[in-house]
């Protein structure tokens, strides 16, 4: 355990620490502007803790020192990039490794991955096909689950406050588990069991390992190990069941099983995808509905598009593709919420950004939360304005950051479709309304969420 680890208190601190733990440190500041270590042993960890989150620390750092900044995590140099221009200089569009996946694997202490370029290309293609095929095969299921939620909300009186975050997490768990892992999760008790174990694992990989508390608390450690073991056991059974057999329902795991992967790679990849997809889908659904409740004009425009595309007919995969404004709503949701505020890459070889040399084996952070609120790139950055994505150059910029197009992570692509179907079903029948006086505070972690429950009300359109 790193000697400075006890000071880490947030998920993202744990995330950065896990990556740094795996690689040698660079001790050169390389003349990059930034702050010197607050403490010799702990670097700028106290500053990050005092800021409340890594994202908020980076916002302040980039405001003070510009687009390329440096700080110290323990005795290790970290460089952060905070504008579109400098990110474009560093992002390699041909790079096949997914930093989100890499960091989660580090936290779970998984060892596979890091293969050759051809192997990584093959795995990326498997992921893409897995998402496409599972969404196509399970569209009717996704529609059914969306309509079940609609029926539940239609039964509420207009004055009833709906716990949005809770309902979206439940919806995401039910839809993702069945589409990724199959019919086992038609049983609500299996979904509840998965959600409980998922919550334990997701929480502990963020706080328990790096602050040392997990090893010191045997009860918590056993709970974590039991939860992870149960998740892995379920996945192993599903993988075994799906091997060498044909099913009418194609699930995400089928694509991995049919690829040239060993059992451990299939287990790890399906675990990462399951963990990440549930959270990203739940939070994207939550934030999209939150923003719609506070923007009557956007909700009206989305309703008109849904009516125009579907009319009185059913929601179909072909017509879903025509929802251009809905796509813009989701892109603007990701941008405004700063859904994934930080990403990272390890500097493989010495590189140059602007006039600054970045030493080899430096951890380079992509301060996406900073970039997505940069007024030089996004006019009126704090305004929820899906119309900004009518501009093709704006969409191209967004895609270059990995939030759409060929560079988006598969979990986000999956979440986009699930959320699109849900909104198509809900907005057609319901007005989504905010609760008067509610202030939603943001909690910045690996995936951004509301600090407390987000409440809404609904009323019938007809």
From Swiss-Prot:
Any Pfam family matching the protein: p450
Protein residues bound to heme: 409
GO cellular component, one term: membrane
EC number(s) given by UniProt: 1.14.-.-
Superkingdom, taxonomy of origin: Eukaryota
Bilayer topology term: Single-pass membrane protein
Enzyme class: oxidoreductase
Keywords, alphabetical: Heme, Iron, Membrane, Metal-binding, Monooxygenase, Oxidoreductase, Transmembrane, Transmembrane helix
Single GO MF descriptor: heme binding
Cofactor: heme
CDD domains: CYP20A1
PANTHER family in the cross-refs: CYTOCHROME P450 20A1
Protein name: Cytochrome P450 20A1
């Amino acid at each position: 355990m790193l000697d400075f680890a006890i000071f880490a208190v947030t998920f993202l601190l744990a995330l950065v620490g896990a990556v740094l733990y795996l690689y040698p440190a660079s001790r050169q500041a390389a003349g990059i502007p930034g702050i010197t270590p607050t403490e010799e042993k702990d670097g700028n960890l106290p500053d990050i803790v005092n800021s409340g989150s890594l994202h908020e620390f980076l916002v302040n750092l980039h405001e003070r020192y510009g687009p390329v900044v440096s700080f110290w995590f323990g005795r290790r140099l970290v460089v952060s990039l905070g504008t579109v221009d400098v990110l474009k200089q560093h992002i390699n569009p041909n790079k096949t490794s997914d930093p989100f996946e890499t960091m989660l694997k580090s936290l779970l202490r998984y060892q596979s991955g890091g293969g050759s370029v051809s192997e990584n290309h093959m795995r990326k293609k498997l992921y893409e096909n897995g998402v496409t095929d599972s969404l196509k095969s399970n569209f009717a299921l996704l529609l059914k689950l969306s309509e079940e939620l609609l029926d539940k909300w239609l039964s509420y009186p207009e004055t009833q406050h709906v716990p949005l975050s809770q309902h979206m997490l439940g919806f995401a768990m039910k839809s993702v588990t069945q589409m990724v892992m199959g019919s086992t999760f038609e049983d609500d008790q299996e979904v509840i069991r998965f959600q409980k174990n998922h919550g334990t694992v997701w929480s502990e990989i963020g706080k328990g390992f790096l602050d040392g508390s997990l090893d010191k608390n045997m009860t918590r450690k056993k709970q974590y190990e039991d939860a992870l073991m149960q998740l892995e056991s379920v996945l192993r059974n599903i993988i075994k069941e799906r091997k060498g057999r044909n099913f009418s329902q194609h699930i995400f795991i089928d694509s991995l099983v049919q690829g040239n992967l060993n059992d451990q790679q299939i287990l790890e990849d399906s675990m990462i995808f399951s963990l990440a997809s549930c959270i990203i889908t739940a939070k994207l659904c939550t934030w999209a509905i939150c923003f719609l409740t506070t923007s009557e004009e956007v909700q009206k425009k989305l309703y008109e598009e849904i009516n125009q595309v579907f009319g009185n007919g059913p929601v179909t995969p072909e017509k879903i593709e025509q929802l251009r404004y809905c796509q813009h709503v989701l892109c603007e949701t990701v941008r405004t919420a700063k859904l994934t505020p930080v990403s990272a890459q390890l500097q493989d070889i010495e590189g140059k950004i602007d006039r600054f040399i970045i030493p080899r084996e430096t951890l380079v952070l992509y301060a996406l939360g900073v970039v997505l609120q940069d007024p030089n790139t996004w006019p009126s950055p704090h305004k929820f304005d899906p119309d900004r994505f009518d501009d093709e150059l704006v969409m191209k910029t967004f895609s270059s950051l990995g939030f759409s197009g060929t560079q988006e992570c598969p979990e986000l692509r999956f979440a986009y479709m699930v959320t699109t179907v849900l909104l198509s079903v809900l907005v057609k029948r319901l007005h989504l309304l905010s609760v008067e006086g509610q202030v939603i505070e943001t909690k910045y972690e690996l995936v951004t969420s509301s600090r407390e429950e987000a409440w809404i009300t609904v009323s019938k359109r007809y």
